[in-house]
Swiss-Prot record:
EC numbers on record: 6.2.1.1
Pfam families: ACAS_N, AMP-binding, AMP-binding_C
CDD domains per record: ACS (cd05966)
Residue numbers binding CoA: R189, G190, G191, K192, T307, N331, S519, R580
Name this protein carries in UniProt: Acetyl-coenzyme A synthetase
Protein modification: Acetylated. Deacetylation by the SIR2-homolog deacetylase activates the enzyme.
Organism (species): Syntrophus aciditrophicus (strain SB)
């Protein structure tokens, strides 16, 4: 915990959308009268037909939540059409390529035309309302066009991060039964090509229900081509009309499926719907980032993750913002890249991850100080808790002590930000996520299911539904209930721990379930374990997180080999490469320890608490080990940890 406190500057209190008095008044109304509050706020969207009921359902029983029942609207209309009269010539999307010499801008009018054309392309291929499409694209403008085109005609998109492996892509295509896959010949990241079409071909080869593959020519490289199945994006767009009326969608119609890691190994298809999600992202984008006309807003997240969905595309465009989209990485061609983009485009609001901040901080101040950054007025962080040291560097060096930092907490499942400082309303505490957003009722519970009042540390739960939340796990509502509503009855269990201080501010302490937060991206330990165990040399594997100075958490794997295989550095490297191929680079173990056996209870359950402590080198007190079937295994692991440290 940091004892530092940064009061709200007087200029911010006067100019921000939300000051302290407004926050208290709006928050109180949102909790005491949610129907009245959200019904009033929904007026910021354009509706084809008004809703009959604002809110239905609770966190009890079968948990069927509905917002704005009977209302009809269209996401692309709210993000594009309604801005054409007043903002048609304003830049909607500023795209910065991997190569600093390459960039593009699309006005609202141009983006609207492109979206309508691609919506007509999809209709010409037989796609209709409710069909699913898998998008496997790099961070290029066509990704934004494709997702908005889906919303225009009621097609449900499932975007898969371009860094995922063919196997991970296949699993996601198969789960949602996507009829069409949209990909590129290659991606570019840090000057290196990514073989996206090759990966997509491998994935689609085992998905016979996929009818068409649409390919964007990003690099112009030679790629395999399946006649009758594969179609060229540009060729299709040239033949399509730029006139496509928006489909009138029910507020509770599915908008997108986004897969996130679960503790059981199989990724969960988080399903978000239309009206509540769009309202929540638009409102929170304006309020939390204090977005005003003329701001240039940049969220650095890849659209393959929820942050990119909500705060690169949907929230900003619903508000008529200019949003920056970046294809590359912070260190290419050098460590000043982020700050040069800020200067090049006049970025005023920057939203990035603690992992990136820590990596940039490690390079020292010089790459930052050689740039100007005078346009910046607000900074944000997302994906994981930020340590006070990184917070202070971000504030002092990047923002030059003039830019408030909004340290936001939320999840794929929540749709938008749930806990955050408001820059014009709250003093900032480095490392604290501060207060709940409107309509959000957080609480802290102990392991016995008791609510903790006042100060305390425990499991973070949300006690009432909010409009942006997921509605189910696609195709598996029971898993939705088991994952979020079985640990504690009648509340949403976040899977995160938290502490509430004497001021009522929240501090997120990290995951409490079998999920690792690597660079702000959630990975299920079971998913990595399954990949390791699929290797012919591995008998068993257990994976835990451990503190990592750059990523926040790293991946620590305990591997038991089959009796006919011997540990070696070559095998260790082979296993890391194997996981990269099976899941993606994000899941590659940082550390592999050879383990003769794993600590298991007599019922066969792995005691992960012990594995976490050993991985973190916190071995002074391993706790009660009397329930282990073979206590001697712990000594072997401790010796192995020590030996590995000296390798």
């Amino acid at each position: 915990m940091s004892d530092l406190l940064f009061p709200v500057p007087e200029s911010w209190a006067k100019s921000a959308w939300i000051d302290n008095d407004v926050y208290r008044r709006m928050y109180e109304q949102s909790i005491s009268d949610p129907e009245g509050f959200w019904g009033e706020q929904a007026g910021r969207l354009d509706w084809f037909q008004p809703w009959m009921k604002v809110k239905e359902g609770s966190f009890d029983g079968d948990v069927r939540i509905r917002w704005f029942s009977g209302g009809k609207l269209n996401v692309s209309y709210n993000c594009l059409d309604r801005h054409l009269v007043g903002r048609g010539d304003q830049i909607a999307l500023l795209w910065e390529g991997d190569d600093p010499a390459v960039s593009r801008s699309l006005t609202y009018r141009r983006l609207h035309e492109e979206v309508c054309r691609f919506a007509n392309v999809m209709k010409s291929l037989g796609l209709r309302r409710g069909d699913r499409v898998t998008i496997y694209l790099p961070m290029i403008p066509e990704l934004a066009v494709a997702m908005l085109a889906c919303t225009r005609i009621g097609v449900v998109h499932s975007i898969v991060f371009a860094g995922f492996s063919p196997e991970s892509l296949r699993e996601r295509i198969r789960d949602c039964q996507g009829r069409v896959v949209i990909t590129a010949d290659e991606g570019l990241r840090g000057g290196k090509p990514l073989p996206l079409k090759e990966n997509a071909d491998e994935a689609v080869g085992k998905c016979p229900f996929v009818e068409k593959v649409i390919v964007v020519r990003r690099t112009g490289s030679q790629i395999p081509w399946t006649s009758g199945r594969d179609f060229d994006w540009e060729g299709l767009m040239q033949e399509a009309s730029a006139d496509c009326p928006p489909e009138e969608m029910d507020a509770e119609d599915p908008l997108f499926i986004l897969y996130t890691s679960g503790s059981t190994g199989k990724p969960k298809g988080v399903l978000h719907t239309t009206g509540g999600y769009l309202l929540f992202t638009a409102m929170s984008h304006q309020h939390i980032f204090d977005y005003h006309d003329g701001d240039i807003y940049w969220c650095t997240a890849d659209i393959g993750w929820v942050t990119g969905h909500s705060y690169t595309i949907y929230g900003p465009l619903a508000n008529g913002a200019t949003t920056v989209m970046f294809e590359g990485v912070p260190n290419y061609p050098d460590w000043s890249r982020f700050w040069r983009i800020v200067d090049k485009h006049g970025v005023t609001i920057l939203y990035t991850a603690p992992t990136a901040i820590r990596a940039l901080m490690r390079q020292g101040d010089e790459p930052v100080r050689k740039t100007f950054r005078k346009t910046l007025r607000l900074l944000g962080t997302v994906g994981e808790p930020i340590n006070p040291e990184a917070w202070l560097w971000y504030y002092n060096v990047v923002g030059e002590k003039r830019c408030p930092i909004v340290d936001t907490w939320w999840q794929t499942e929540t749709g938008g930000i749930l806990i955050t400082p408001f820059p014009g309303a709250m003093a900032l505490k480095p490392g604290s996520a501060a207060r709940p957003y409107f309509g959000v009722k957080p609480a802290i519970m102990d392991s016995e299911g008791r609510f903790l009042e006042g100060t305390g540390t425990g499991n973070l739960v949300i006690t009432e539904p909010w409009p942006g939340m997921l509605r189910t796990i696609y195709g598996d509502h029971q898993r939705f209930l088991d994952t979020y509503f079985s640990t504690y009855k009648g509340v949403y269990f976040t899977g995160d721990g938290a502490r509430r201080d004497e001021d009522g501010d929240y501090w997120i302490t990290g995951r409490v379930d079998d999920v690792i937060n690597v660079s702000g991206h959630r990975l299920g330990t079971a998913e990595v374990e399954s990949a390791l165990a699929a290797h012919s040399a591995v008998a068993e594997a257990a994976v835990v997180g451990f503190p990592h100075e750059i990523k926040g958490q790293g991946i620590y794997a305990y591997v038991t080999l089959k009796t006919d295989r011997q540990p070696s550095d070559a095998l260790r490297k082979e296993l890391v490469s194997w996981v990269r191929r099976e899941i993606g680079a994000i899941a590659a173990p940082d550390f592999i320890q050879w383990a003769p056996g794993l600590p298991k209870t007599r019922s066969g359950k792995i005691m992960r608490r012990i594995l976490r402590k050993i991985a973190a080198d916190d071995i002074a007190d391993l706790g009660d080990t009397t329930t282990l079937a073979e206590p001697a295994v712990v000594d072997d692991l401790l010796k192995g940890r020590l030996a590995a440290a000296w390798e």
